[in-house]
């Protein structure tokens, strides 16, 4: 759940991602129609999508309709939370994995980026200042990740504008990239999907440089942050206390689900022995442990891999992560949540650099100075 005082009344409101079935009561009357392929065959969704999504075809192309629960926007009305997502214009039922509040247009009102996994579009909701939001992603973003996961915001070039990064699963070397490449040929390929999303969705990280014009430049390749394997959490912070925002990235997965060879073996088993054999096949596989990443911001929109140097390139299946000054010495420490193992707690031993600690206090009801930048 992501918190922000989006209506600027002095108390925290919250946006809750919900990405699982069964549907809520409001979806009980949803109807789906059969979509046929070019030879009259039904269009079959990938197995992971069949539980909670349908597909429709319009004159402008294909569109996915998700049938999971809606996300929730809770407005804090003096200690009582009221769900206002529909009236606020942020009513989505896609497979959300992260939500980030940030004032991207510097108008003083918190805006919201929702990163959605699988085929669901990402959304950049501009806060209109009247309790409602407008999705400006199609005109503000050149493209987004395909399988968006973790995300974070920071001013990576110290120009006073907040930039943003959303993660995906692009392989960090040639072998990983080819082994996880999707099938783009034949009737069961994903090639149809590349034609209809606006903005387009590509399977790699996205780094959005804020131009201050209402549009972003996507510069992941330029920064060196485009491909970090099966990425989950992204956490920006000045880890070396040099005045520039560095970034920690957690990686790994319970199984190597995107390995093309393994997927082909699974499909052959299912065809010959049934779906139970396919599930048993994956149960016998080891988790996909990958190294976590740490990148130092070198300035000029360049980042260098310093994970080994900083002792953060631990090979594990790491999902969530959080930065904070745990020991009160003025630098940022790190906590990482690991699948099937104990969490990692990393103390920052930085002895150089400058620190500044602020204790902000607001006026009136906003005692905690919510919304201060």
Predicted regions and their residues:
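Acidic, glycine/proline-rich Ca2+-coordinating loop motifs
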Residues: 1-373
